[in-house]
Amino acid sequence: RGSTDRSVEICKTFAPNWEIRNSKSLEFDAYLVDQEVMEIEREITGWKMVLNTTEFLCCYNKEQFFKSLNTMSGNMFSIRMIMMIDEPTHGYTNPRYSSPLVKQRYHGIIIQPNPNQLYLNGRLIHNNSHGNYRVGRHGSHYPYSIYMEPAFIFKFFYSPWNDAMKKRKLQIGPTLSQHSVRRGLGSHHITTIEKLEKKYKYYATLTTDLRLFPEYQIIFPDLCP
């Protein structure tokens, strides 16, 4: 769909066995993209999860993770999200392709569920024919439970905070469909570099060292002091 963040090139290089499909939608329309995603899900059996380019599912043991899904009651689970945000005084350097990005950054905010509210911050994994998603795919019209074992979606939100990430955030807004703009879907993508820097400074005051959290230590024991 005309992406300029090299995501297709990156997939071909690091995941050559992946199937790459061109989107049917020439513009970025959250509703239409979700419908297209669900059409593709109908072609697949077993556990399914839809992630954006900047999102990574991390757990300590993949086999144990899927075994737990099969033994738990339910067909759909929300995996909690960690918003990755660089701590400005930590001295992070630009990422290296020789090491997984999730092992090069360890500051962020764990979005924990509120028992009195529907959790609409994670990503859903399910074995239904499709996800029946709410717009944006953080929630579903199907019932789902929150997966509370040590597994997270690492969303690189304001991390790595370098020129490449800033350009990626700025490229999305101009591709929004008028339908999305009118409905306020994805309006946060319509921004400027000044607004991005202001938001980063705010989120940087909230970011924490994830290595201090027991659940993170289980997933990445080699990164923890």
Question: What kind of feature is each model-predicted range?
Answer:
Residues 18, 47-49, 74-76:
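Short, Asp-centered acidic motifs that coordinate Mg2+ and/or phosphate
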Residues 12-31:
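Conserved donor nucleotide-binding strand/loop of the catalytic core
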Residues 1-10, 24-26:
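A conserved acidic beta->alpha catalytic loop
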Residues 45-59:
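Short beta-strand-to-loop acidic/aromatic patch adjacent to the donor-nucleotide binding site
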Residues 30-35, 59-225:
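Catalytic-site signature of metal-activated, phosphate-bearing donor transferases
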Residues 13-15, 43, 71-72, 148:
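Short, well-ordered coil/turn elements that cap or connect secondary structure elements
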Residues 34-48:
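Active-site nucleotide-sugar/metal-binding loop of Leloir-type enzymes
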